[in-house]
């Protein structure tokens, strides 16, 4: 009695939010107007002629070093999605089998992770502009792996689990705020759509495949494998991410305090 929660209000709420979001996009986002403003701004700054020249020349392909960085970045994307989505997908079963949690009480930890990500997005963006995207992503991958390792150490649920999952959210924000901009940074403006599709192909493929692979381990080896599985893919993501040499963005730092005031008229 009372062990099976009613999920209907949750699904209804999500559906309502999605409909509201769709209506906002339909009626408040004027894509044609924004495109016209962008073109006018490009003409004002003399950018549009440069883009036409590039397109007429056939659109230069990515150089070998940039292409190599892009490939490693895309594999990193796949690996950290393999780690994160394995845990979020199977955590309910893990919490039930390993910790004896019932009645949807496991949802609190996942909610804390979402809150951790939500409160971190803006600070992470600020920190990334100061220290660079790659460093913040590597920090996020390490924090994610350590958090999953800490989750593996818990033999029963307690308040510290919420702290760990809050850190999972912070780590996930550190990764996601910076990964897609790095992909965009490597491509030309006319190729953004193509590379966006490639980025989401890798991320979605990982999200589809990881429940199958992690589920096999859970079923044939044991539920204890969930967090070690995630840690292994975090380690793989860290290795591939260290091989990325392009797509980062850091502001130029003046060599001296006086140079900070050296601005052309």
Question: What are the functions of these language-model segments?
Answer:
Residues 1-16, 216-234:
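A membrane-interface helix-boundary motif in multi-pass transporters
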Residues 15-38, 237-245:
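C-terminal membrane-cytosol helix-exit motif in multi-pass small-molecule transporters
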Residues 89-105:
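Short amphipathic helix-loop junctions that connect adjacent transmembrane helices
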Residues 142-156:
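C-terminal ends and interior cores of transmembrane alpha-helices
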Residues 31-74, 257-265:
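Juxtamembrane intracellular "pre-TM" segments in multi-pass secondary transporters
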Residues 103-104, 187-199:
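Loop-to-transmembrane helix entry/capping segments in MFS-fold secondary transporters
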